[in-house]
Design a protein with these regions (language model features):
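Accessory, often N-terminal, substrate/partner-engagement and coupling regions
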Residues: 1-49, 53-55
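Residue-level marker of beta-strand positions
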Residues: 2, 45-47, 53-56, 87-93, ...
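Short, surface-exposed secondary-structure boundary micro-motifs
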Residues: 8, 53, 58-60, 99-100, ...
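P-loop NTPase nucleotide-binding/switch module
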Residues: 17-36, 66-68, 92, 96-149, ...
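Short beta-strand segments of a lipoyl-like beta-sandwich/carrier module
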Residues: 30-49, 64-89
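P-loop NTPase nucleotide-binding module
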Residues: 136-184, 234
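Conserved P-loop
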Residues: 167-209
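Conserved small/polar residues in nucleotide/adenosyl-binding loops
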Residues: 236-238
Length: 238
């Protein structure tokens, strides 16, 4: 599933369960409830810190790292046990960490993190040092954008803000496209849902939708739900 609402509910599954009228308090797991292939990156006895890779899981053309919890407080944690390479359920325990006091933490292939809580266990903050090629002449020539940078497109109704967003999503030199369609943008995202599956990704030769994630919240949804899309987007891209 690659289309979500602001709370990261997968919209196709939400439609199957609720139909056209959303029920109060519905929340679905954004991670597919199935088995995945796990490959360990550590062995029993290895020391680990917050954010260290414990294993990896492939999904399509990408490889996800299974990391030690971001909130590990001290440096005394070690790998007590880890699963061998194989296929396991997404919620199954694949590794167990233990500190000097005997406290244990069981790790599965997924864990939750508050969307508004910053992640501080990084070694270095990378600064933008490479130009993002969008293949849109007016941007690449007159207003070049750095990879990891930010730019804004203001304008009145009909100025072409959404068209520019869609063109950039189709042509930009990036590994994955994440579109946060909040408000009016979500009403126009239907074009993306119809067009992207039919477009061929020049980098992989596969469907462009395979590396695209869309978060939809229309103007009729509460402001809080639309605001949540921004936080959800910022966490997904990590």
């Amino acid at each position: 599933t690659q289309v979500y609402d602001g709370l990261q509910n997968p919209l196709p599954k939400l439609a199957e369960q609720c139909g056209f009228f959303l029920e109060r308090g519905v929340y679905l797991d954004p991670i597919p409830d199935k088995e995945w292939e796990f490959t360990p990156c550590v062995k029993p006895g290895d020391a680990v810190l917050a954010g260290d890779a414990v294993g990896s899981v492939p999904e399509g053309q990408f490889t996800h790292l299974i990391m030690a919890p971001f909130d590990l407080k001290d440096e005394g944690w070690r790998v007590k046990s880890v699963k061998e390479k194989g296929v396991y359920h997404v919620r199954s325990t694949v590794a167990v960490l233990e500190n000097g006091a005997g406290e244990e933490k069981a790790l599965s292939m997924v864990f939750s993190w508050p969307v508004k809580q910053p992640i501080r266990c990084y070694e270095e903050r990378l600064r933008p040092d490479e130009t993002l090629v969008t293949k849109i002449r007016c941007i690449d020539t007159f207003l070049p954008v750095a990879k990891g940078g930010t730019f804004c497109v203001p304008g009145p109704f009909g100025a072409g803000k959404t068209v520019l967003q869609h063109m950039e999503a189709k042509n930009a030199d990036v590994d994955i496209v994440i579109v946060a369609a909040c408000g009016e943008r979500a009403g126009e995202v239907v074009e993306v849902l119809k067009e992207f599956p039919e477009l061929t990704d020049p980098r992989t030769g596969r469907s462009l939708m395979e590396r695209t994630i869309i978060i939809c919240n229309t103007s009729s949804m509460p402001v809080a739900a639309r605001e949540a899309s921004v936080y959800t987007l910022s966490l997904i891209h990590i």
